[in-house]
Amino acid sequence: DRVSRSRYISGLVVASTDDSADDPIADFCAQKGTPLFRGSQYDVLDRFYQCARQYQADVIVRVTADCPMIDPMEIDRVIAAFLEGGCDFAANRLPPPEKRTSPIGMDTEVCSFAALEQAWQHASEKFEREHVLPYLYDTPGRFRVRIVETSPDMGRLRFTVDTEEDLQIARAIYAAFAN
């Protein structure tokens, strides 16, 4: 629901694995009428590429399932930066050693289909295949990369669900703001 509130996103697809452990995700998507693409559990880059290809996406916006409190305005901010031009990839954070200024759990990455296709064709490292877009930003000069920083710096805030404790906090937040 939160991603679909973006002013820029015209289509939403959940890209999950073809592992039977993720059948509940497929059931949830079917129940909600949300398109679902299933692909490799380990070659996530291939899953994203095949999904984007099947759905004929020109621009790919990647947010992850461990970010259920993602802010649609943050998604739009990164998309707008990408659409301004001058880059093949835009994100509001990169892995360390890069400094994070957006809260953990608001992670948004945007790239063109052409850049995703090049990554899919050329990424050969396991890490690049598993984490989808490192091929686009790991080698300076290979692609035009734009980092969308947050001011003031909110990089220490945490709105993700990676642990049981995170889940309990998320449930409490959702309960407090149920309406």
Put a short name on every predicted segment:
Residues 163:
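Short, conserved phosphate/pyrophosphate- and ester-handling motifs at nucleotide-, phospho-/glycolipid
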Residues 175-179:
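Left-handed beta-helix
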